[in-house]
Amino acid sequence: MSSDQEMAIFGEAAPYLRKSEKERIEAQNRPFDAKTSVFVAEPKESFVKGTVQSREGGKVTVKTEAGATLTVKEDQVFPMNPPKYDKIEDMAMMTHLHEPAVLYNLKERYAAWMIYTYSGLFCVTVNPYKWLPVYNAEVVTAYRGKKRQEAPPHIFSISDNAYQFMLTDRENQSILITGESGAGKTVNTKRVIQYFATIAVTGDKKKEEVTSGKIQGTLEDQIISANPLLEAFGNAKTVRNDNSSRFGKFIRIHFGTTGKLASADIETYLLEKSRVTFQLKAERSYHIFYQIMSNKKPDLIEMLLITTNPYDYAFVSQGEITVPSIDDQEELIATDSAIDILGFTSDERVSIYKLTGAVMHYGNMKFKQKQREEQAEPDGTEVADKAAYLQSLNSADLLKALCYPRVKVGNEFVTKGQTVQQVYNAVGALAKAVYEKMFLWMVTRINQQLDTKQPRQYFIGVLDIAGFEIFDFNSLEQLCINFTNEKLQQFFNHHMFVLEQEEYKKEGIEWEFIDFGMDLAACIELIEKPMGIFSILEEECMFPKATDTSFKNKLYEQHLGKSNNFQKPKPAKGKVEAHFSLIHYAGTVDYNIGGWLDKNKDPLNETVVGLYQKSAMKTLANLFSGATAAEAEAGGGKKGGKKKGSSFQTVSALFRENLNKLMTNLRSTHPHFVRCIIPNETKTPGAMEHELVLHQLRCNGVLEGIRICRKGFPSRILYADFKQRYKVLNASAIPEGQFIDSKKASEKLLGSIDVDHTQYKFGHTKVFFKAGLLGLLEEMRDDKLAQLITRTQARCRGFLARVEYQKMVERRESIFCIQYNIRAFMNVKHWPWMKLYFKIKPLLKSAETEKEMANMKEEFEKTKESLAKAEAKRKELEEKMVALMQEKNDLQLQVQAEADSLADAEERCDQLIKTKIQLEAKIKEVTERAEDEEEINAELTAKKRKLEDECSELKKDIDDLELTLAKVEKEKHATENKVKNLTEEMAGLDETIAKLTKEKKALQEAHQQTLDDLQAEEDKVNTLTKAKIKLEQQVDDLEGSLEQEKKIRMDLERAKRKLEGDLKLAQESTMDIENDKQQLDEKLKKKEFEMSNLQSKIEDEQALAMQLQKKIKELQARIEELEEEIEAERASRAKAEKQRSDLSRELEEISERLEEAGGATSAQIEMNKKREAEFQKMRRDLEEATLQHEATAATLRKKHADSVAELGEQIDNLQRVKQKLEKEKSEMKMEIDDLASNMETVSKAKGNLEKMCRTLEDQVSELKTKEEEQQRLINDLTAQRARLQTESGEYSRQLDEKDSLVSQLSRGKLAFTQQIEELKRQLEEEIKAKSALAHALQSARHDCDLLREQYEEEQEGKAELQRAMSKANSEVAQWRTKYETDAIQRTEELEEAKKKLAQRLQDAEEHVEAVNAKCASLEKTKQRLQNEVEDLMIDVERTNAACAALDKKQRNFDKILAEWKQKYEETHAELEASQKESRSLSTELFKIKNAYEESLDQLETLKRENKNLQQEISDLTEQIAEGGKRIHELEKIKKQVEQEKTELQAALEEAEASLEHEEGKILRIQLELNQVKSEIDRKIAEKDEEIDQLKRNHIRVVESMQSTLDAEIRSRNDAIRLKKKMEGDLNEMEIQLNHANRMAAEALRNYRNTQGILKDTQIHLDDALRGQEDLKEQLAMVERRANLLQAEIEELRATLEQTERSRKIAEQELLDASERVQLLHTQNTSLINTKKKLETDISQIQGEMEDIIQEARNAEEKAKKAITDAAMMAEELKKEQDTSAHLERMKKNMEQTVKDLQHRLDEAEQLALKGGKKQIQKLEARVRELEGEVESEQKHNIETVKSLRKHERRVKELTYQTEEDRKNVLRLQDLVDKLQAKVKAYKRQAEEAEEQSNVNLSKFRKLQHELEEAEERADIAESQVNKLRVKSREVHTKIISEE
């Protein structure tokens, strides 16, 4: 016991952990009468304290503490322990150990709130139902590193012991916290996790990851936070517990090599999902529902569309809605915080809450029945709308899927009607499935977060699983939970009791086996063994017409009255009906089987599951992502068949699989047990119900554990350790200087000590002590050490006293001497001579003293100086030391940094290598593109030079034309009289303008549509341009950094190679040493184990020999009598065998017919029913025959037993039999050696199989990786194809200048959209085909697993057969007869052998464990061997059946193999044809692509010409505006407007002609496109058909993959050659793909240039349209002005006539003549002004000609790609030159005419002065003639311009044609790329199929070889059996002859 000072470290928890010293002293001093103080049995309280009053006649009268007097029997009175044992911490230490002592010890400790108590090797805890301060941080610190006996009992002590064991023993640990529901298991689990998270912190923070803006917690925080989240979604209130875990969890906490936390993971078991939709009255659903509705977070209420009243929701309000001990609001905050700490994203958090809310809404969905129909229909859609909204589904689709689900019938899907109840059941199933899958997904996410990827070595597992449950209504969930607790209790018993006693047996300790009455095998076998409850349940689930009633009848038929643990319950009033009862270790439970079949199959509405998979909520879609495929394969089961092939896996099978995994994990660890106890049913703190606690103590094995500790030997020490430690007790017993064995020394030592010699035993390696004896030895050792130390101290004290005494004697003598001298001095000090001496003496020594002082001063100075120097030197050295230490630290930091930088550099080096490879590929691509661009540039340069030469010639011609035009313009003044004609023509122009206005509106609408499309494309182009610029910058940066990194990389590589070499050498040496060490350790352990086994077997067989000597003679005497009975039995057996074979044959025929007819019509189903009835009848007949044979065998066995009893004393030939037995013993030893070697062979084979399994798993992962890469490649190609198609559509839309073109291209776009949909459908089909391939691969793996399991079972069966046959001897024939008869009864089990192979493997393992535990005596050995013979005979038959099945399967494989080979050759031929066609298409694509590029250039030229035309229109508009400003020169302006109008009309006519031509061309191109498209579609369809055929072939190939065994090796060489050829083709296609990528990039650049040009063109088009509007307004204004001028002209004409008359009247008058001269002078001045204006116009026209020259230069650029038209253009140029020469001649004539006109004008002026009227009229006539000539010349010029424009249009047509050709090239290139991608994908699939077939081939051959070996061993075993029979007969005949 610790003192109060030692307990002070526990702080305020100390009073709750251990009694104080004062209480312990008071307890020891309390009066106590051991004779009268007792516990007495009492009906109400079970046991009470009392005092014995009297004892008479076996009766005891006891007075209780309450004052009552009881008279009971002696066995109902139990003595009390002394007061010092009150509240003892380890109940195994009590003097009197019985039920009342344990009960009251727990009760008294519980009353003092000490809730933890040790009970032998485990800990008992009682639920306090209140908070106690025993889990604080200071308590954790106090328990850290403490041994169990050094600290009070506590869960922290158990945890620390497990932690220390893990570190010291290097073994995984587990803590099993078990008990009934409500006992406190979950709380203790949390405390264990809290302890580990505190003591094993990593010391540094986990990397903080930012997820959705939130920072995650450390690993310790996350481990602790996992509990609140799991409790919110997995805990609920039950009748016995407010916070009951409705799921089991096994938490593994992983630790690193230093003992620090590394990671954690959680495995969950058996979530009670039925609680989501149903609760009892006193219970409630999971906490999360009520937390959300607590209104702590109103935003959740709003988001989930719910209220705060739980009664509004049917699923969560069937029981209670509040729990007093739980604050739902605070718990919601804790849950939300845990979600943050565990790193869930915001989307995941919202999804969790939304799915939870959707489950609540599901419960409120209402449905009703249609009138006059059974069909259900929704009763309102509001709730469904909310649920669908929360799950991102369509409400109408959800309701339709619920009411009208689609089910698969054969190969088709049909719509099925649902009744109202069926719909409600489906809704409930969906709600439970969503909640369960969400819970499992959360656990997976938590595990991902807790997996830190740190190195981990060992783990400590904490098991917290639902406790034993007994409710009013117990269903399948309760059976699973109780069965789990039953298995755990069995594990506890096995570990605590059986292993303990096996240890004694192994050590040779004599030990009486204790029967604890806790053998749970009967109940467990009733549930899980073949024909058990689970087996019958799964069998019923396979029959479509099975019901709960048929299930109950089968249970009754199989178990009622045959198993003591299975009973029929008694009906109870007021309770739900129960169908059967099971007697568990904790009590009898009544089970209701209602709905068990549906629960076990767990069906879901597949239509709704399909909606879930397509949900926009990613979390929901992920939860059900694999449901459809799994269910389709599983045949409607909950999970896809993992190990059962095509059969579905039920809930019970999945549960048993998980339970077996859990038990396997537990068996691989060192367990620590914690037992939780419920003190009372009312949850009252401090109260304890005696009967309840006693029941738990009995059922939990607590009392039995204490008893075995007391009766056993819990303390054990190795002999060497015992000798070393306790030699001090009697050193004389072990002689010094003489070697003596440690065991003998320990025996002598214990024999010489005064202890009870019955309290210890000597084993082979250890000495064993009963409880308490080791403590006594420790006390004796302490006493002995105290004596020795006392003696040592006495001698030391004596020695010190003698030393001190000697010193005292010496001091006394010194004092005597001093006293004598002082007395003498006192006598002589007054003498005169003495006084003189005193005066002179100092003077004599003063000189010497002065010298000495001077010397001393000098020495002092020197010493001082040296001291200063030393001090300075010391300081200097200290400074140096500090500097060196700092430098050392810096160097250490530098070394660490360099190590880190080296690691980083290595990572960067790897990344740079990858980057370098990528950049080299990019550089290579860029280099190739640059070379192509250089070639193109050189070609363009040559063309440019040639065109420049041609341009210079054209410039000369244009200069001549300019001179001619300048001269022509000078003649404009002669055209003034054409104003009238212009006025008439303007009316026609108005009509034309009106038409153009209408056309303009139509163009504006089309233009607006084009602008919208153009804007979208510009945005895309801008984005791509930015991305391109950014990528180019990145490439430049990477190229710059690459050079720097190369240098660093070279240095790092040299260092890395050196380090890698050193590391490799060190690792190899380390691995060699470790391997040698492990091998030696394993050999040593194995030898020790074999030695101990052989020793025990020798002893057993010695006893066996003695008994066999007695029994053999009895058996041999009885053999003769039994042989006669055997002959009769053989006759009956032959008859039964014949019947069995007939029935088996009929049964096989019926089974084959049933399998062939499975999925047939109703008539076939009826026939199956009849056959099943016949089968049942045959089975009953068979069972009756079996019962008869069993009765006969029982009679024989009874007779045999009687004869054995009668002949028991007839023993005479004992010695001869003994010699024979010794000989047989030696033979058995040899057989044991053979069996050991066989076991080693089996273990090696098992290891090889495990390696093979791992290799297959690696191959599967590689296949998955390849499949993902193929999928990514397909996605990239699809995206590229879609992008190119989009660009093609955009190019088409850019040419939409008219409404009609827009409609046509829209139809083209629709066609492209349909084509894209078709391609998507094709892609989906390919994906489905790949998924089918994956499923086929998975099924192949399943078949492989089944074969491997069959092989392992066969191996085990053979080994067990050999062991059994070596010991069965003469009884084999009799037992074989019995078990062959039993085999008839198990025909049905043989039919289900494939399904139950995995279960039999587990049974075999448990059987091996049972065999090892039951070798105590000969009778048990004989019984065990008989059981093994029985099982092995069944296994032999099953093995033969399996062999036959394998032979049949082999023949099928051979057939399928031949089919595959033929299909493979066909596929290869088709693949070569496809490759040839692909190459030809690629060549065509390249040609078309070149033509397409030329077309793009022509399109660019066309756009520039359009721009120039718009510029010309703009210039003309400006000229018209200038003409409007000169009203006073109306005639000249009219002439100019007429000319401009003519030009505009010509331009408009030309535009109309061009437009009509363009429309015709577009229609023609559209037709060509349609033709090309139809051709491509046809080719695509052909390729699709080929691809579909290939896919079908490949699907058949994959389905028959198991058949590609022997033929694949022969075709491997051909496949390798084909692979090389395909790789060459692949390289060619990759080159073509790179070229196509370059062409695509160039097309993208051209597209961007075209977009820029189109944008400029659009701007100019807008300006032209605005100018056209202005022109229209100006024309109207000019028309009005022309009318005014016409009126003025008429007035002038009238005035002229009047003047003429006046001139005739006053001709002689001078004044009139003078006025006339003045008028002529004015006219002359006007003509001079007109001349100047014409000169100005000529200068303007010259400027326009300069613009024309610029346009000609632009035309040079346009002619880059039109070299083919050069000849035509040259001819046209020649014609133009002729025209120009003609115009030159005309120009000269005109100049001459102008001179003549000038001369005539002068003469006219002179004549005008003279008044020559006739001359003026002649001049006017001449002017008209000249104007006519000028007009004809203008017309000729206009025709010339039209001809030139026609040629330009021809050039544009050629450009456009080239562009269209280039587009076609791109389309064909896309098609070729897609076909190449498909060819590559199928090539990879073929390679993968080949690899898989090779793997399967090797596996099959290996299995076949192993099967042959097994058959050989079986033959050997049969031969041994025959030998044994012969030997038995010989022995029998010898005995008879001797008698």
Curated annotation (Swiss-Prot):
SMART domains on file: IQ, MYSc
Modified residues (Phosphoserine): 392, 625, 1092, 1096, 1162, 1237, 1243, 1261, 1288, 1292, 1303, 1306, 1474, 1495, 1514, 1554, 1574, 1600, 1603, 1714, 1726, 1739
Pfam families: Myosin_head, Myosin_N, Myosin_tail_1
Domain Myosin N-terminal SH3-like: 33-82
Binding site for ATP: G179, E180, S181, G182, A183, G184, K185, T186
Positions of modified residues (Phosphothreonine): T64, T69, T419, T1241, T1255, T1265, T1286, T1467, T1501, T1517, T1730, T1736
Coiled coil start-end: 843-1939
Localisation per UniProt entry: Cytoplasm, Myofibril
GO BP annotations listed: muscle contraction
Annotated IQ domain residues: 785-814
Location of Pros-methylhistidine modifications: H757
Protein's UniProt keywords contain Zinc-finger: no
UniProt modified residues of type Phosphotyrosine: Y389, Y424, Y1464, Y1492
Family: Belongs to the TRAFAC class myosin-kinesin ATPase superfamily. Myosin family.
UniProt protein name: Myosin-1
Gene: MYH1
